[in-house]
Amino acid sequence: MNETRTTVFVQDVTLRDGMHAIRHQLAPGEVAQIAAALDVAGVDAIEISHGDGLAGSSLNYGPGSHTDWEWIEAAAANIQRARLTTLLLPGIGTVDELRKAHDLGVRSVRVATHCTEADVSAQHIETARDLGMDVAGFLMMSHMAAASELAAQAALMESYGAHCVYVTDSGGRLTMDAVRDRVRAYRDVLDATTEIGIHAHENLSLSVANSVVAVEAGVTRVDASLAGQGAGAGNCPIEAFVAVANILGWQHGCDLYQLQDAAEDLVRPLQDRPVRVDRETLTLGYAGVYSSFLRHAEKAAQTYDLDVRTILTEVGNRRLVGGQEDMIVDIAMELSEVAADR
C-alpha cells in the first residue's frame, strides 16, 4: 500500500514581512518583479502589504514608500496562479481596508492579533468570510502563551470562521519541542477540517527546523520568504525549506532553482542591512522580542549611544508586544539616563 505523501501549502511573505527588513521601502516595479518570479516558481500564495499589515504605514510603525494599494495592484497584475494574500491587524487595518483590498484582487487574508487577544478578530474574520475570502487567524508572539492557552485562542478564531490558524513565532523564540506542543494542542481542540499554519523566524537559527517539526506534527501551511527576507533575522528561507521538503519527499508546487534565483537576483540586492543571525537579531530570539522591533531599537541605540542588545533585553524584560514601538524610545532614554548617572 502506498503511503499518502505529506502535502505542504507554501505561503510566501517576502512582500509583507520582508518589508520590515527594508523599512517598508519598496517600489511597485520591484513588487511586480518579485511577485512574478514567485508566481512562476510555484508558491501557493503571496502576501503583500506594509510590514504591519493594511494601513500600517504610520510614524509609529514606519511610513511606507508607497501605499498598500499601489503594492497590491503591482502584485495582482503579475500573478497568474498564486493566491494573492494580505495581512490585517485589528486596530490598525479596518474592514473598509479589507474590502478595498478584496476589490483589488486579494482573495486571502490573515487576521493577526496578540496571542491572547483573539477576541478582537471576530469582526474582521466574519467580514472576510462574507466576502468569500480564504481566512487565517494569526496568533502573534505565540511563545508568550502556554500551548493550552494558545489553543483556546485558536479555537476562538475558528469559531469566528477562520479556515486556518497559525502558530506565529514573531519573536523567533520557540524551540522545536515548543512548536510541536503548540501544534498538537491546536489539533486537539480544532475541527479536523481546520488547517494549522506555522510562521517561523530565524532569530535562533531554528526557522527551517521549526517549520519541519510543525509539518510533522500536522501543519499544512508554511510561511517562508526569499532569502529569508523578514523582520529580525528573517523568516524561514523558502529555498532552504523547499530543499528540505524535497529531501523528505513532501509534495508542493515549488521550483527550487527558480526560488534560489529570485532570492539572489531580486531580494538580496534590496537589503540595506543583512538579514541574518547576528548579535542583535540573536538577542531578539534569546529575549523573546517582537522581531520587527529590531530597526526601531537600532535607531534608538544610535540616537542615545547605547548597545542595541541592552535595549532589546529590556524590551524583553518588559514583555512589550506589537504596537508598543513608541516605548522603545522611552526605554532608550531611561537606559541612557541610568548610564549617565554611573
UniProtKB/Swiss-Prot annotation:
Root EC class:
lyase
Q: Which InterPro entries match?
A: 2-IPM_HCS-like, 4OH_2_O-val_aldolase, Aldolase_TIM, DmpG_comm, DRE_TIM_HOA, PYR_CT
Record-listed Mn(2+) binding positions: 17, 199, 201
Q: Which of this chain's residues are annotated to bind substrate?
A: 16-17, 170, 199, 290
Q: Which GO terms describe its biological process?
A: catabolic process; L-leucine biosynthetic process
Catalysis: reaction(s)? (S)-4-hydroxy-2-oxopentanoate = acetaldehyde + pyruvate
Task: Identify the keywords attached in UniProt to this record, alphabetized.
Answer: Aromatic hydrocarbons catabolism, Lyase, Manganese, Metal-binding
Q: Where is the active site?
A: 20 (proton acceptor)
Q: Where is this site: Transition state stabilizer?
A: 16
**Pfam families named among the record's database cross-references:** DmpG_comm, HMGL-like
GO terms, molecular function: 2-isopropylmalate synthase activity; 4-hydroxy-2-oxovalerate aldolase activity; manganese ion binding
Query: Which protein family is named in the record?
Result: Belongs to the 4-hydroxy-2-oxovalerate aldolase family.
Give the matching NCBIfam families.
4OH_2_O_val_ald (TIGR03217), PRK08195.1 (NF006049)
Name of the protein: 4-hydroxy-2-oxovalerate aldolase 2
